[in-house]
């Protein structure tokens, strides 16, 4: 990646000189605020959010793993979603916390690529997993008598494995395509993590091919998963409308309400960030959108799936009784 040489008094960087150009070896992540007075406050806020997110998601994973009453397809998918959210927030938050307590805002080229790659793995995998969860809810509501046979252990495992495989393959294409670009100007990224949009803004090469490849990868994944979710929920809605009793309709809807909220939060923030025309591009708005799907969504998902879930509440109650010292 080629940068013209430039002087910087605020930051120092390690570059390799080749001819009259400089090969970049690191980026500078500005984060949320350059004001040093805000750094302790931001550190405290993000540390609190990080600890709550980790504890919430790992509690769900452990409960689903250890309680035999939660060994069902629905909770199998919820457990994998919680693991993804645990992974997602861990890709970004430690670097955010480190930048809040250190004046060194640098991230190596390899570190930037790794951060983009692993964030893409989680994002793409979650797209596929949410579609698989919609199919699970479709099978439970539309064909309840055949549900156990339809959502077999082999099928559930295959859907989750396929989600991860698709996530890794898409992430490889996304990351490799991004880092084939040449960048010009200062190596300063006005963001709190290495994401494709701010990197593309720094590119000094023609991004037409990049945009076509990225549109194909992102477009296929997002549109295909949204289409699968929409088809599932149209069938679910039709099945609910055929239920005669109000209590039956309420119970059927409540089984998929949490998933529907999670879908709207995740895809809403992604579409807000990536579907807007370039003329309306704003780094500040992108920071807010990125903060939502990288930090807020993983924080909210454990609450969404557990607050009104009697099975998880009961499993948590039994777990706390088990670990309490006998008196």
From Swiss-Prot:
Gene3D superfamilies: Rhodopsin 7-helix transmembrane proteins (1.20.1070.10). It comes from the Eukaryota. Glycans are attached at residue 20. Residues 1-43, 93-113, 174-212, 274-286 are extracellular. One of its GO terms (cellular component) is plasma membrane. Pfam families: 7tm_4. It is a multi-pass membrane protein. Keywords: Cell membrane, Disulfide bond, G-protein coupled receptor, Glycoprotein, Membrane, Olfaction, Receptor, Sensory transduction, Transducer, Transmembrane, Transmembrane helix. It is found in: Cell membrane. Residues 65-71, 135-152, 234-252, 308-327 are cytoplasmic. Disulfide bonds join 112-194. GO terms for molecular function: G protein-coupled receptor activity; odorant binding; olfactory receptor activity. Its main location: membrane. The chain crosses the membrane at residues 44-64, 72-92, 114-134, 153-173, 213-233, 253-273, 287-307. One of its GO terms (biological process) is sensory perception of smell. The keyword Cell cycle does not apply. Belongs to the G-protein coupled receptor 1 family. Odorant receptor. This is Olfactory receptor 9G4.
């Amino acid at each position: 990646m080629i940068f013209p040489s430039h002087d910087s008094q605020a930051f120092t960087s390690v570059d390799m000189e080749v001819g009259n150009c400089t090969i970049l070896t690191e980026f500078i992540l500005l984060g949320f605020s350059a004001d040093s007075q805000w750094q302790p406050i931001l550190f405290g806020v993000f540390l609190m959010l990080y600890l709550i997110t980790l504890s919430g998601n790992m509690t769900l994973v452990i409960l689903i793993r250890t309680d035999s009453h939660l060994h069902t397809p629905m909770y199998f998918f919820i457990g994998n979603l919680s693991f993804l959210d645990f992974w997602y927030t861990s890709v970004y938050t430690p670097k955010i916390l480190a930048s809040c307590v250190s004046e060194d805002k640098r991230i190596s080229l390899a570190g930037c690529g790794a951060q983009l790659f692993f964030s893409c793995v989680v994002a793409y995998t979650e797209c596929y997993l949410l579609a698989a969860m919609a199919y699970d809810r479709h099978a439970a509501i539309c064909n309840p008598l055949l549900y156990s046979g339809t959502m077999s252990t082999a099928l559930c495992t295959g859907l989750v494995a396929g989600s991860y495989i698709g996530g890794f393959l898409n992430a490889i294409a996304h990351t490799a395509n991004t880092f084939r670009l040449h960048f010009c100007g200062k190596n300063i990224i006005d963001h709190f993590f290495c994401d494709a949009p701010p990197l593309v803004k720094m590119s000094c090469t023609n991004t037409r091919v990049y945009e076509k490849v990225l549109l194909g990868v992102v477009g296929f994944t997002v549109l295909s998963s949204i289409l699968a979710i929409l088809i599932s929920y149209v069938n679910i809605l039709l099945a609910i409308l055929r239920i005669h009793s109000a209590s039956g309709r309420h119970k059927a809807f409540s089984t998929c309400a949490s998933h529907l909220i999670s879908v709207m939060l995740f895809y809403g923030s992604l579409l807000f960030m990536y579907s807007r025309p370039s003329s309306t591009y704003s780094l500040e708005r992108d920071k807010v959108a990125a903060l939502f799907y990288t930090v807020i969504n993983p924080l909210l998902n454990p609450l969404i799936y557990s607050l009104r879930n009697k099975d998880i509440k009961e499993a948590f109650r039994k777990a706390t009784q088990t670990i309490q010292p006998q008196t």
